[in-house]
Amino acid sequence: YDKIETIRKQLLNSAKELIIEDFGAGSRKGLTKKRKVCEIANSSLKPKKFAQLLFRMINYYQPETILELGTSLGVTSAYLASAKPDATLITMEGSASIASIAKNNLNQLNLKNVRVVEGNFDETLSNTLSNIRQIDFAFLDGNHRYQPTIDYFNQVLEKSTENTIIVIDDVHW
């Protein structure tokens, strides 16, 4: 956990500014075009205890294919990927500038089992799923609006088995 938490601390202290495009429900602070990495980290990163719970779930259930909607800065992605290095993690992020930071963080951790897909889930999820035989574990944490979440869940369900685990985060309907 230590290397990932070091990256979390760096992100929480980063004053670097990004131009972002938010396709989801937006942050609690509202949509803005220019945001500091530390602001994104403060509002979007999963708390350590929840990210580590996901790590333990992956470690226990040993899924082969993991799908994450909502890469953000890559901290939770790092926990998912490091829990089972021989699994494939496909993580999706709407904002190219945020995805770029995530890729850098995942590379820093030398996680080779991750593929980052950039773009609006409405435009990228269907094609991404068409290239996956089945999903063993899905973490839906990207767009928090009701209808898109239901739509994404139903698409993921088509690639699920009776043993698939689907975790939906931040549901506030």
Show which residues each predicted segment covers.
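A short alpha-helical cap/connector motif
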Residues: 1-137, 143-167, 171-173
